[in-house]
């Protein structure tokens, strides 16, 4: 829920699912569930799509993208076969959410992008795809 609130509005052309144990008054077209398991079930059930959205949503039947927070990341890592991670090469002093440690005995680097620089912040970052060993 907190991650969704930080984004401010639903991400376009996809089904947005919020996982919240406390419930959440989400805008139309956003699905709210109690657990990660329910989120995966909602993602795979086309009946969860409001008819107005169904023609606009790009479907990825075999992929779910988890965008936070820390507890959800840790749960998703236990069942994922692949992770696409943006590594930002900086330290944020007042950060309150951290991605769990990626255990090299479980995950291997399958692909790594070149290092990019964000023009607004000046932070260097790269995209790394990990696959389960």
Model-found features: residue ranges?
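Enzymes that bind and transform nitrogen-containing heteroaromatic metabolites
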Residues: 1-133
């Amino acid at each position: 829920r907190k991650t969704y609130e930080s984004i401010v509005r639903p991400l376009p052309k996809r089904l947005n699912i919020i996982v919240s144990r406390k419930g959440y008054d989400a805008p139309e077209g956003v699905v709210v569930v109690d657990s990660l398991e329910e989120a995966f079930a909602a993602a795979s059930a086309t009946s969860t799509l409001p008819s107005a959205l169904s023609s606009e949503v790009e479907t990825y039947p075999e992929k779910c993208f988890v965008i936070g927070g820390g507890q959800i990341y840790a749960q998703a890592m236990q069942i994922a076969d692949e992770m696409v991670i943006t590594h930002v090469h900086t330290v944020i002093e007042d950060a309150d959410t951290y991605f769990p440690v990626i255990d090299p005995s479980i995950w291997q680097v399958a692909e790594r992008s070149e290092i990019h620089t964000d023009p607004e912040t000046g932070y260097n970052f790269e995209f790394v795809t990990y696959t389960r060993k």
